[in-house]
């Protein structure tokens, strides 16, 4: 087995409370220097990542917003391979007056507001999908998962999932695990 790609989750995997341990940055730099292609794969909104750290200095791709958005730092290209959320879904969620986190390609809230999200999806004939993760519910374009976003990034970079290890901790990491040759759930995984 030849592994040359490391795909890793953020929250609960390499970060705790919006903080990456300085030693983790050292290990990421060492892995990159040894020739590993690093890929951050997170449910976080893309714009939030800059406050946590300089991932673009380490990663060949940043798969954000639960796979709905992929950023390639080498050429500063931002891609939404599954499109944007349907306008009717966005409009109805905004009108529902629930707390929302709004990304470039997704919207998210927390339980117990998932009931409102599911009603909106039903009223819009399921023009989007929903995924739960640690008490959050993310509303995504059809086809977007961490695994599908990661496969898109690998394909664009000419890399293979057969040479990839994926590391994560939560239910939204399962699709990423399914793509990898080797999958690792960290000790505190849920």
List PLM regions with ranges.
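Conserved acidic, metal-coordinating active-site core of Asp-based
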Residues: 88-181, 188
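Active-site phosphate-binding/coordination module
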Residues: 17-101
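Short, basic, glycine/proline-bearing loop/turn elements
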Residues: 9-15, 35-37, 157
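Asp-based phosphoryl-transfer active-site loop
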Residues: 2-19, 177
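Short, well-ordered beta-strand core segments
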Residues: 6, 62, 183-185
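Short secondary-structure boundary segments
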Residues: 43-44, 187-190
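Active-site metal-binding loops of divalent metal-dependent hydrolases
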Residues: 12, 44, 169-170
């Amino acid at each position: 087995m030849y592994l040359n790609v490391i795909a890793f989750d953020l929250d609960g995997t390499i970060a705790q409370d919006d903080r990456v341990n300085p030693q983790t940055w050292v290990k990421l730099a060492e892995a990159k220097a040894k020739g590993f292609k690093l890929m951050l794969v997170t449910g976080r909104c893309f714009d939030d990542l800059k406050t946590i750290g300089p991932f673009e200095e380490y990663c060949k791709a940043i798969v954000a917003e639960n796979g709905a958005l992929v950023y390639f730092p080498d050429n500063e290209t931002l891609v939404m391979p599954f499109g944007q959320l349907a306008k009717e879904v966005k409009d109805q969620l905004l009108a529902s007056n629930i707390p929302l986190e709004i990304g470039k390609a997704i919207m998210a809230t927390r339980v117990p507001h998932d009931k409102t999200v599911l009603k909106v999806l039903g009223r819009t004939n399921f023009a989007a999908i929903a995924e739960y993760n640690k008490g959050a519910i993310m509303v995504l374009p059809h086809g977007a998962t961490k695994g599908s976003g990661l496969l898109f990034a690998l394909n664009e970079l000419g890399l293979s999932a057969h040479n990839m290890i994926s590391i994560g901790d939560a239910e939204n990491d399962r699709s990423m695990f399914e793509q990898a040759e080797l999958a690792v759930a960290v000790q505190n995984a849920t």
